[in-house]
Amino acid sequence: MQLYHHPYSIDSQRVRLALEEKGIDYTSYHVNPITGKHMDPSFFRMNPNAKLPVFRNGSHIILDTIEIIEYLERIAEVSSGIEDATFNREVVEWMRKIREWESKLFTLAHIPDNRRLYVSKFLRMVVIARMAESPDLASAYHRKLREAYDTEDKLKDPGALRRSKDHLLRLLDEVETKLEGTTYLAGNEFSMADVMLIPVLARLSLLDLEEEYISSRKNLAEYWALVRRRPSYKKVIGRYFNGWRKYATLVKTWMFVRVRSLLRKY
């Protein structure tokens, strides 16, 4: 089994958390979306959406995050011979509810404009370069260019940004209420619902928004402290973004983009 992913990707974090929690072995391939590696023709042919993660088991390829997690759940049950009682209807409902909030727009809105626009321009140049290399994929690459411009338009729309924030606030308020009576999101046992939520909280922390969105909610703050102690969190997220590590991770990527842009090597 192979997983194409990157530590920056929320959906990648979700799948990796599930893999670690289930104890499933896999081969890891890093595909950095900020440096444009997800636009390489070999990856693009496998996944024309150019989104992460991509899970592959032999000839079987799964692109949807929840479908990947459900597939991993079935693998774990077959391997153990025991049905996971924590994977129930409530868990699935929470998984889908959490996914409804789109993190990309919110994240980009909290990145300084000069850096965001610099990376955006770099990625557009990467797409154009790959289009020249693989003309048979031109229509798919054109679609990615349109998506990039659409995203920039949304970032200029105060209404779109407000709706994204309001959606997140409603979700966190609902989680806060739920955690009033349970240790974890779908009960007193850790489940795949938590796997979907944890990367959202990690993203807020990465953006230095923990005080506003997490600490201000008592139950959520206690939950956040609890899940960060899990070995899966430490391996998937903590090793890249805890303390000084987040600066090392971000600086390394930023320098790559700067150098490639200066050399015009896309």
From Swiss-Prot:
It catalyses: RX + glutathione = an S-substituted glutathione + a halide anion + H(+). Glutathione binds at S9, I10, H38, M39, K51, L52, D64, T65. Residues 120-250 form the GST C-terminal domain. InterPro entries: Glutathione-S-Trfase_C-like, Glutathione-S-Trfase_C_sf, Glutathione_S-Trfase, Glutathione_S-Trfase_N, TCHQD, Thioredoxin-like_sf. GO terms for cellular component: plasma membrane. One of its GO terms (molecular function) is glutathione transferase activity. One of its GO terms (biological process) is response to toxic substance. It holds the Pfam family GST_C_2. Disulfide bonds: none annotated. The keyword Cell inner membrane does not apply. It is an enzyme of class 2 (transferase). Its main location: membrane. Belongs to the GST superfamily. This is Glutathione S-transferase TCHQD. It comes from Arabidopsis thaliana (Mouse-ear cress).
